């Protein structure tokens, strides 16, 4: 009776047209249901049957239905899938040739049917790691999700899976680039000054092979210091647009992961031909600058294409122990090295004081280093504080990069610059209001200037804690890479252009070529904005890879502590609606403390990212940068999540 009824069809069409629709992101839960978040303001419940049509992270359009004053979302159209290419673990049942894959993501737990592409002949076993690409989606008219396996990564028993899986996830190279060593010859027709008689020294870790900077310093009759910064010159071997140049441009950076690195350049170049090894003549680009009594740089800055010869390979810890009066077997091997170390220390102290007064100095935080055995097991995690020798090299490199920025700006007006513009103007009123609430009166317009930003930073550095600094840090812009000079608010400098790590950074290779063009008075080609985009994307991928491997290793290391009485001091680094994130001071691991662990009565606790505090019964119980004792409650190896509980 009702079949093909035009009135009924019209009614359905009207009801469909009248049903409100929203676009948003699907947020999954581990309980089968989900939510559709719209513009971060409103969320709609997605019942379990409807969640089978979508995946956490999908951007969709959904119909909103109201039943007994309760709203729910019915997914209708896929705008952008969350999963396209992904890594995961294969599932295969014994005696069954069918394959499934579970994506390696904390909120994606459903197995997706899959099959290998024709060219992939690896016989997959249960729990193998693989790369897959989504091929079917229910909102695209398919009956179910389906994926295609495109790469085998490694098997379930490989203890180095954290590295291989992470590199494949971020589509990063696994090995050093390989080129015919016979092609690694000098292509350098630029006249070089012979500076091999100067007593350059390198300062690195004991295990460092790719030594790309050497320092020489002397005191002039007028009391000023003359600092020479020699930087390895791979551009003497790498012609623009050559095969090797293309490789370096693609990789953009050496990738430093816990336990090992994947170099940007062939190791024959980075660890041998270009490495500033002691007593070996090497091509270098050298910057010479004077440092006055108050630590200011002189206006006279000279760049040379030169030959240098390091006279000694010095080690950070040895120099620091000796200069800091620690018990050590090491001492300068001769008077020349002794003089260099003492003058470099003087330079470092003067430059540090000058930067504190006229620019900005970063708050020092320790670096955390994983100690691994040959099988990739974490034996220990050590905190390495920045010591005297580290500060010597840091001040010399910052000085060199300031000089490069000045020379490039004066002579060309372009280069590769690190630019940081401070606070986002959209949030500057919130910054001013937050500061006012804590007794600091400011002018919003002044905070957007380099001088005003520096003045505020120095005032914040004098605060008894970093709470206020952490509150307003989220209103800052991210640092960028630009082809034209601009200020670096974070360093408190008018311009900053790095060139001191050309073995490890392609941006520094580009600046080397521009500096050489200035030296030779030849034409210089302005870098493309696309170069900056590619370098920034690769830097982000490398940092994410380092974080992901670190999370995996932290989870392995802390798993034995879960549920024990072992106590760790932890710094509160973020506060969200669901709880707080902390960093373990001893080893740098990030853990999450759910709000119910802070206070059991839900209506009596408020976790506020806006105020950077946790309010319990109307009183501030925790705030950003507090140090609190915690125990490890649970470690989920599958998701690399560490859950802690305050004591």
Curated annotation (Swiss-Prot):
EC main group: hydrolase
GO molecular function: exoribonuclease II activity; RNA binding
Annotated RNB domain residues: 192-520
EC number: 3.1.13.1
SUPFAM superfamilies, per the entry: Nucleic acid-binding proteins (SSF50249)
Localisation per UniProt entry: Cytoplasm
One Gene Ontology term from the biological process aspect of the record: mRNA catabolic process
Gene3D superfamilies reported in the protein's UniProt record: 2.40.50.640, Nucleic acid-binding proteins
PROSITE patterns: RIBONUCLEASE_II
SMART domains: CSP, RNB, S1
Function: Involved in mRNA degradation. Hydrolyzes single-stranded polyribonucleotides processively in the 3' to 5' direction.
Originating gene: rnb
UniProt cross-references to InterPro entries, sorted A to Z: CSD, NA-bd_OB-fold, RNase_B_OB_dom, RNase_II, RNase_II/R, RNase_II/R_CS, RNase_II/RNase_R, RNR_Ribonuclease
Record-given protein name: Exoribonuclease 2
Oxidoreductase keyword on record: no
UniProt similarity note: Belongs to the RNR ribonuclease family. RNase II subfamily.
Keyword Magnesium: no
Domain S1 motif per the UniProt entry, residue ranges: 565-647
Keyword annotations from UniProtKB, A to Z: Cytoplasm, Exonuclease, Hydrolase, Nuclease, RNA-binding
Higher taxonomy: Bacteria, Pseudomonadati, Pseudomonadota, Gammaproteobacteria, Enterobacterales
């Amino acid at each position: 009776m009702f079949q093909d009824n035009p009135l009924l069809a019209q009614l359905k069409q009207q009801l469909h047209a009248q049903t409100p629709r929203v676009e948003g992101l699907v947020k999954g839960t581990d309980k089968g249901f989900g939510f559709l978040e719209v513009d971060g303001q409103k969320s709609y419940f997605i019942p379990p049957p409807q969640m089978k049509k979508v995946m956490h992270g999908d951007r969709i359009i959904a119909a909103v239905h109201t039943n007994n004053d309760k709203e729910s979302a019915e997914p209708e159209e896929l705008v952008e899938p969350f999963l396209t290419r992904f890594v995961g673990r294969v599932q295969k049942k014994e005696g069954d040739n069918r394959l499934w894959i579970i994506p390696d993501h904390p909120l994606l737990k459903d197995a997706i049917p899959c099959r290998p592409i024709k060219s992939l002949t690896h016989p997959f076993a249960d729990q193998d790691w693989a790369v897959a690409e989504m091929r079917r989606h229910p909102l695209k008219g398919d009956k179910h999700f389906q994926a295609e396996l495109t790469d085998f990564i490694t098997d379930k028993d490989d203890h180095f899976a954290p590295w291989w899986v992470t590199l494949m996830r971020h589509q990063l190279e696994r090995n050093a680039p390989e080129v015919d060593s016979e092609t690694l010859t000098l292509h350098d027709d630029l006249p070089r000054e012979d500076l091999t008689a100067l007593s350059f020294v390198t300062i690195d870790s004991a295990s460092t092979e790719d030594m790309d900077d050497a320092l020489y310093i002397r005191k002039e009759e007028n009391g000023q210091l003359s600092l020479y910064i020699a930087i390895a010159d791979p551009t003497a071997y790498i012609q623009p647009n050559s095969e090797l140049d293309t490789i370096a441009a693609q990789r953009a950076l050496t990738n430093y992961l816990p336990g090992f690195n994947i170099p940007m350049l062939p190791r024959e170049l980075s660890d041998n031909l270009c490495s500033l090894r002691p007593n070996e003549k090497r091509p270098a680009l050298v910057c010479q600058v004077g440092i006055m009594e108050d630590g200011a740089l002189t206006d006279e800055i000279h760049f040379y294409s030169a030959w240098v010869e390091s006279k000694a390979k010095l080690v950070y810890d040895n120099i620091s122990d000796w200069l800091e009066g620690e018990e050590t077997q090491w001492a300068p091997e001769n008077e020349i090295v002794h003089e260099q170390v003492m003058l470099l220390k003087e330079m470092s102290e003067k430059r540090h004081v000058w930067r504190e007064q006229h620019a900005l100095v970063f708050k020092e935080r320790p670096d955390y280093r994983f100690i691994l055995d040959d099988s990739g097991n974490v034996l220990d995690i050590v905190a390495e504080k920045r010591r005297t020798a580290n500060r010597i090299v840091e001040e010399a490199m910052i000085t060199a990069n300031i000089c490069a920025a000045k020379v490039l700006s004066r002579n060309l007006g372009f280069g590769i610059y690190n630019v940081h513009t401070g606070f986002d103007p959209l949030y500057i009123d919130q910054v001013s209001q937050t500061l006012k609430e804590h007794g600091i009166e400011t002018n919003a317009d002044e905070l957007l200037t380099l001088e005003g930003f520096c003045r505020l930073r120095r005032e914040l550095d004098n605060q008894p804690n970093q709470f206020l600094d952490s509150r307003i840090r989220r209103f800052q812009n991210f640092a960028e890479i630009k082809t034209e000079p601009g200020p670096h608010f974070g360093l408190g400098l008018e311009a900053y252009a790095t060139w001191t790590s050309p073995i490890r950074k392609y941006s520094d290779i580009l600046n080397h070529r521009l500096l050489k063009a200035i030296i030779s008075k030849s034409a210089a080609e302005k870098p493309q904005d696309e170069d900056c985009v590619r370098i920034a994307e690769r830097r982000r991928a490398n940092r994410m890879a380092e974080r992901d491997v670190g999370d995996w290793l932290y989870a392995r290391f802390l798993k034995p502590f879960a549920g024990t009485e072992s106590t760790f001091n932890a710094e509160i680094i973020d506060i969200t609606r669901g709880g707080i994130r902390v960093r373990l001071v001893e080893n740098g691991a990030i853990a999450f403390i759910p709000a119910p662990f802070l206070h059991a009565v839900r209506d009596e606790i408020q976790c506020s990212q806006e105020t950077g505090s946790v309010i319990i019964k109307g009183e501030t119980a925790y705030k950003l940068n507090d140090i609190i004792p915690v125990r490890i409650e649970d470690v989920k190896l599958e998701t690399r999540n560490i859950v802690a509980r305050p004591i």
